[in-house]
Amino acid sequence: MDIRKIQVTGGSSFVLSLPKSWATKHHIQKNDPIGIITQADGNLLITADIKGIHTQREKELFLKDYPDTECLFRCLISAYITGFTSIRLTSKIRIPSDVRQMVRVYTQMTIGQEVAEENDTSITLKDILNPAEMPLDNTIKRMYTIVKSMHEDAIAALEEKNASLCQDVISRDNDIDRLHWLISRQYHLITHDPSLSRKMNITAGTAMTFFQISRTIERIADHAVTIATNVQNLLLLAEEPDGKIVISAETIQMFRRADEMALTIFKRSMRSFYDRNVHEANAGIVSLTELTALYTELKALSTHQQNPASIYFGYISNSIARIGEYSSDISEIVINHCIGEE
């Protein structure tokens, strides 16, 4: 830390000299304006960027270091999430077709990423999205809407024995991944760029809350996919010679009840977040006890099923319970956020 003494001039003006190395780095000249931002913790931030221009960050990946395209894909996602605005893939030889195909998948799976330049030995990806145009609140609401419909349709597919609906639920998980990665990226940008935080009118602490909730919703989506996948397995089992799903009407009704309980906890937790309501969040946590008791009954029923389908029913009941537990986690995040803001 560079410690400097305050000077008083004219009896009322407080003057602080700037480090020469910093002024030189940012090409500060006499009479140039600089920005002073008061942070939430009372500290002052001095910046040469008075126009609030988004910081440009570049990342170069050499293909010789990433012979595995799956590893390269994960590194591209990491570069995207951590806020790089330009990503360049370079190679000493012609870039293989599988890498180019992977890049196309990457641009389809991310929001705002496009190929800006491309030749035989390099590919440059640019971020064309203005972060301020995608408020975190809107993205969370969209994630909630998609996941809620995934969960409802997964259970409906079980009741209706609808294989195509199962596949539709599974495909929607890609949308959730894209939105979660976007929120993760914006969270990193906000925490590293105070001007963006100011432009989006959101503190780093609030951005962290959005990120935590987004990550939890993404996990709830994974369990909706698990339900849909196991319903598919049940339907395939029924198509086998002499295959028959043996499940009582009572068990179907218990699945429906457990599903409605889990979905109610999810809705309540998200409503408490929108309303910043601690009591609503706490009520969601308390209601988890009833779902846990019903899950215990469902698990026992699944175990006693005398047919190959019992294992799939067990997976489905477990995922319903996990959806309720993750929804309860959202309520805890909401309480932490609300108390922290007081």
Indicate residue ranges for each PLM-predicted region.
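Cytosolic, long alpha-helical scaffolding segments
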Residues: 2-6, 11-13, 17-342
